[in-house]
A protein has these predicted regions:
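Short beta->alpha connector loops at strand-helix junctions that form conserved
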Residues: 45, 452-454, 473-476, 579, ...
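Conserved alpha/beta-domain cores
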Residues: 97-98, 521-523, 529-906
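C-terminal accessory/binding modules appended to enzymatic or scaffolding proteins
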Residues: 18-19, 403-445, 551-553, 835-851
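Glycine-rich phosphate/ribose-binding loops and adjacent secondary-structure elements
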Residues: 334-336, 436-444, 450, 456-462, ...
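Nucleotide/phosphate-binding sheet-loop regions of phosphoryl- and nucleotidyl-transfer enzymes
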Residues: 1-393, 420-422, 426-429, 436-438, ...
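Structural motif
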Residues: 242, 412, 429-431, 450, ...
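Long, charged amphipathic helices and adjacent flexible linkers at domain junctions
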Residues: 228-233, 369-421, 426-428, 508-551, ...
Length: 906
């Protein structure tokens, strides 16, 4: 280790600045910055993150040269303040706090009031004129130091404290008398001796170095490790340690402590927002022991301090070009700034603040785009619960928050019931063990979806996000009875028709009916509000228009219906990246014909059934083309195995048994069901998702692809004849070999030529493939000789690369994440080293064969900001995601383009 490792700061002077977060951590860098620009900051020094790394490597010892540097800076602090650490007459007290590069609130350790001992406590009492205050500070030090530094369980201090309060019949700490505090000091010191075999150190310098070591050590405590894993923070950064002169807000009626924001973090309104308490310590604001006052009230109680705070916070916001979250203390009328950092805010506030700051001339449009987390835009699109109403309802259970928004409705357990109830005007929540593709109609009819099993990429989760439906999955406290009549949560039974509410932002399941309200953005898109009536919508569209100026990636939407397409287009989608034809088959009127086709044993019979389906498909595609107004529409030919369109084998067996056991068995009905059961058994596969599906189905049943392609081009030609523009892209799924693609392309091209000949019009189109199995990626150069575009189906590409079913993997994926086997869930964020390497290879090889090859992504990863960054880096042309994720993708694509520009890229 070489060079400077300890950095001093005081009002008007600082060794560091805000650009040194890697060295000083976020807290230390901002303290240095505030001090450097002349703000009233309690003086102190920061020990660098590099020392933390060295500390971990050197058997948890602070290097000798760093100790010397610490003592040198301590002397500087003592000279500046006129106080001395450990001095009995005028003791210097300091806080020792962590501060990593990225904010990790509450994850690491802090020690306050360091420097107190049996002698200096008397000096503090004389100096403050308040012996009780001094004793309480010492009590807090023993508690924190004993826990953080000496390893005495915190609960043991709490037990002593609670016992004392119970004995004295008091409720709050501030009610403890001087005598009671002296007794607690004695008991705390005895506890430390009993637990550690050592006395509490009376030497102040010894306390300091022990506390610094403990804070470094806390970088690797379990909660900090977990927090970094969950928030994608590298584990090897280390924390800095900030040693700072203590200031006290509980020195009397001219002292106070508080926290605040330079703008309202919930609404974005430009106002000083926060709370403070007179004659209190910072932890009292957080603990709620006393009700704090709004900062505005300080204007009356402490007008001079309020004016100074207003001036300082306005200066901070202009200096940092962002909303600031600040902490302050007033000691005997003097204001001290303890911390500033960029303020966390809601999605609504984030967009308003970004736009307002551009219009105020505070930031550029490009800077504004980097101020909003892409995922936060979700909050502007989904219905939300009325906050006050929600507080009145019991939380029954919690699951995974799979699709955001708020929904309230009556419980139903079957998709068919959801539809019938909805047709009667009822609002319903569909509750299932898990959902499958044939539940689509019921999911669509529901206000929200709740499943007992499944993960963030389960069918319910993916479809819920696509539909914009609130969805909670993996709620394992819910036990459905076998007949599907009710579900049980411990002693509470919830029956069909009972009202529940689900919160797709928190994952909570609540009892009863809670009032919801749609977002203003959605109200405008639906035509329920005019754009000029919604300030939120105006901010939303203006902000995203800036994003569109800078992004390179196109953004499309996964949409199967005209309604989906209409919503996607309103959200700014530039085409449809995935239209799943099989979802169109599940409509009630069509299911009989698809079943007829599946049950037919001869090709001629199948063609007759398909002829009945063709008009439906043609109408579907016509409506999609009309909605997209000439933008590309990528249509995937049939993908799932045929058995998914038929009833489950077990359900059929039960139904047949019930019919046979009835008093008047319907023989014709029984024979029909038995024939259906035989076909279901014949189509059954051990591993259907790797079986007879995708292009394999199209090759063995070419008449299905002929019908679908015919319907596509009949619809396209009709639009052209009407003077419209259309550009269909037909996508062949599950291709693993160039020969498979060539086979299907021939069928599609023939259908296109026949339709154009019939209608005497020309229609531009292209034929491409999904890249969703490793062999397709590896042989991309061969496939690209025939395919005009690729689209990565990353859901299946991840499954086939890992050899893991995304639904069956739920049971152990979380275990992998918790234990650090994986850093991320590969079904939510592209695994760049494995799946991503296959994608990179496919892009390079594909464009070697066809330089103008268009390449996109249509898996669930298309709406994940970090995956979008990767897609930009490897040169994709577009991403496709659910309609409600289109705004997120537009912003994420802009942000990666800006980052690339900042780093000197093109």
């Amino acid at each position: 280790m070489s060079g400077k490792q300890v950095y001093f700061f005081a009002q008007g002077q600082a060794d560091g600045n805000r650009d040194m977060k890697d060295i000083l951590g976020g807290k230390g860098a901002n303290l240095a910055e505030m001090a450097g620009i002349g703000l009233p900051v309690p003086p102190g020094f920061t020990i660098s993150t590099e020392v933390c790394t060295r500390f971990s490597q050197k058997e948890e010892k602070i290097p000798a040269e760093v100790n010397e540097e610490v003592l040198s800076n301590l002397k500087k602090l003592e000279d500046l303040t006129g106080q001395k650490l450990g001095d009995e007459q005028n003791p210097l007290l300091v806080s020792v706090r962590s501060g990593a590069r990225f904010s990790m609130p509450g994850m690491m350790d802090t020690v306050l009031n360091l420097g107190l001992n049996d002698k200096t406590v008397a000096g503090l009492a004389r100096k403050s004129g308040d012996r009780r205050f001094a004793l309480d500070c010492y009590r807090r030090l023993l508690h924190m130091f004993g826990d953080v530094v000496m390893g005495v369980p915190k609960r043991k201090f709490e037990q002593i404290l609670q016992g004392k309060k119970k004995k004295l019949n008091i409720e709050y700490d501030y009610q403890l008398s001087e005598e009671a505090l002296e007794e607690l000091l004695s008991e705390y010191k005895k506890l430390i001796k009993q637990e550690t075999g050592k006395d509490f150190p009376q030497e102040a310098e010894e306390q300091l170095f022990m506390a610094v070591g403990a804070v470094f050590k806390s970088w690797n405590n379990p909660r900090a490790i977990t927090y970094r894993r969950l928030n994608h923070i590298p584990q090897d950064l280390g924390t800095a340690v900030n040693v700072q002169m203590m200031v006290f807000g509980n020195f009397g009626e001219k002292s106070a402590t508080g926290v605040g924001f330079t703008r309202n973090p919930a609404t974005g309104v430009k106002e000083l927002y926060g709370e403070y308490l007179i004659n209190a310590q910072g932890e009292d604001v957080v603990a709620g022991v006393r009700t704090p006052s709004p900062l505005k009230a300080m204007k009356e109680e402490m007008p001079e301090v309020y004016d100074e705070l207003t001036e300082i916070t306005e200066r901070l916001e202009k200096h940092y070009h962002d909303v600031q979250d600040f902490e302050f203390t007033v000691q005997e009328g003097k204001l001290y700034m303890l911390q500033t950092r960029d303020g966390k805010r809601t999605g609504l506030a984030a967009v308003k603040i970004a736009v307002d700051m551009v219009e105020e001339g505070l930031v550029s449009q490009e800077e504004a785009l980097m101020m909003v987390e892409a995922g936060a835009l979700d909050q502007l699109l989904h219905p939300v619960f009325d906050a006050q109403e929600k507080k009145k309802h019991e939380v029954l259970a919690e699951g995974l928050a799979a699709s955001p928004g708020a929904a309230t409705g009556q419980v139903v357990f079957l998709a068919e019931d959801a539809v019938s109830w909805q047709e009667k005007g009822e609002a319903v929540i569909l509750v299932r063990e898990e959902t499958s593709p044939d539940d689509i109609h019921g999911m669509n009819a529901s206000q929200g979806i709740l499943t007992a099993t499944g993960g963030m990429t389960s069918h319910a989760a993916v479809v819920g996000r696509q539909m914009g439906k609130p969805c909670v999955v993996g709620c394992d406290r819910i036990k459905l009875n076998e007949k599907g009549e009710f579900f049980q949560i411990e002693k509470k039974r919830v029956k069909e028709g009972d009202w529940i509410s689900i919160d797709g932002i928190t994952g909570e399941v609540l009892d009863g009916q809670i009032k919801t309200k749609p977002s203003a953005v959605i109200q405008v898109i639906r035509g329920e509000l005019k754009p000029e009536q919604s300030e939120v919508y105006q901010y939303f569209t203006k902000f995203l228009a800036w994003a569109d100026k800078v992004r390179k990636l196109k953004v499309r939407a996964n949409a199967d219906t005209p309604e989906d397409a209409r919503m996607a287009f309103a959200f700014g989608a530039e085409g449809i990246g995935l239209a799943r034809t099989e979802h169109m088959f599940f409509e009630k009127k069509r299911l009989p014909f698809i079943k007829e086709m599946i049950l037919s044993e001869e090709e001629e019979e199948r063609r007759k059934a398909l002829d009945k389906l063709l008009p439906f498909q043609r109408e579907d595609f016509y409506d999609l083309f009309k909605e997209m107004k000439g933008h590309p529409v990528t249509i995937r030919t049939i993908d799932p195995p045929l058995h998914e369109f038929l009833p489950r084998k077990e359900d059929l067996m039960v139904k047949i048994a019930e019919l046979k056991a009835s008093k008047n068995p319907e023989k014709k009905r029984i024979r029909s069901l038995e024939k259906l059961l035989e076909r279901v058994k014949a189509l059954s596969e051990f591993n259907p998702m790797l079986g007879h599906r995708g292009c394999r189905l199209g090759i063995t049943y070419p008449e299905v692809i002929e019908m679908q392609a015919g319907a596509i081009f009949e619809a396209a030609c009709q639009v052209v004849k009407e003077g419209g523009r259309v550009y269909p892209e037909i996508m062949v799924p599950l291709v693993g070999a160039a020969e498979e693609f060539e086979n299907q392309k021939q069928v599609i091209v023939k259908a296109a030529e026949e339709a154009m000949e019939k209608h005497k019009v020309k229609c531009e189109y292209s034929v491409g493939t999904m890249i969703e199995i490793p062999r397709a990626a590896i042989t991309a150069d061969e496939i690209a000789k025939q395919a005009e575009f690729f689209s990565f189906g990353t859901n299946d590409l991840t499954q086939t690369t890992y050899g893991i079913s995304r639904d069956d993997g739920v049971g152990f994926i979380n275990h992998y994440l918790v234990h650090g086997i994986w850093k991320d869930n590969p079904f939510m964020t592209v695994d760049q080293d494995g799946v991503g390497e296959l994608m990179r290879w496919a892009v390079e090889k594909g464009r070697q064969s066809r330089p103008d090859l268009k390449i996109g992504i249509c898996g669930v990863h298309g709406g994940d900001p970090r995956s979008i960054f990767f897609c930009h880096q490897i040169g994709l042309d577009y991403v496709s995601c659910s309609a409600y994720q289109v705004p997120i993708a537009r912003l994420a694509a802009a942000q990666i383009a800006l980052k690339e520009r900042q780093q000197g890229g093109k």
